[in-house]
Amino acid sequence: ALHPMHLVQHVHGVMLAGGSAYGLDAASGAMRYLEEQGAGFNVQVARVPIVPAAILFDLAVGRADVRPDAAMGYQACLNASSNPPAAGNYGAGTGATVGKILGMGQAMKGGIGSASIEIGAGVLVGAIVAVNAFGDVVDPATGQIIAGARSAEVGPLRIGAPGYFADTMQVMRT
């Protein structure tokens, strides 16, 4: 585990991808790129890039045989920039969905998003998240479901209208 008291104290890259366990291969592409740049943990005989990966299960979206691989992980490194990352259905967010409790037909698109804040002295703290939830996305201030499993009888209702969402917690209780 990555911990300040352990031998390896630095991460050289982080890989977020879809593809279930197959998507882990994308991290090896990032490792190859970083190795070529001379980055990595020095183990005397080589430098080993430390690239933790977080992978989403999204095989039910699109074709299950199309998934991230080492070449895509390498290409992602080549495409990296200092610009803000794309949000929505890009990268790891491509196949992300929310509200799957009633099946994929009632689910909604999830995605990827990021935020950052400068906390002073030039220190910038950032976060990136890929939302691929089985249940609902709930506004913590109001408790209102803002994305999730859609009721089968949606009809002409607008998103967020009463009856539009099937409350995952209620579905689980029944």
Regions inferred by a protein language model and the residue ranges of each:
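Active-site-adjacent structural elements in enzyme catalytic domains
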Residues: R32-L34
